[in-house]
Amino acid sequence: MCVSIISNTIINLILGGSSNDSANQLLFESYLNKDLIFMFIQSVILAPVLEELLFRGLIFRSLRSINRNLAFFASAFLFGFLHIYSALFAGDLTQLVYLLSYGGMGFVFTYTYEKRKTICVPILMHMINNLVAIILLVFM
């Protein structure tokens, strides 16, 4: 969460103080207007479990035996890319700056996975991060 806040602040400074939101955040906000329960289940339960199993449990673990640095980079970069790819393919190249934020979170989750030797901790961190994001969107 701290990584996200710091990197989003840097991004806003780079963009000249713009308050542009990431495509991922805009998607969250669109769900808020439709079905909060669906958004909660998808964002706080399903996405963290599936994303951590894919990026830490499969990608990082598979690549770590080949090259630890490559494993960290691939896991974090692909995690970040997942959160912006739809906007990029729609032509919004400004979303590239959010690779810093999402990739940073991916790095923190990967580091935690490696140090704790369990996928449960980054899953829980990811769940808490997404829950805090939803709470902030609902009450702000």
Task: Give short role names for the model-derived ranges.
Residues I5-T9, N33-M140:
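Transmembrane helix-loop-helix hairpins at the membrane interface
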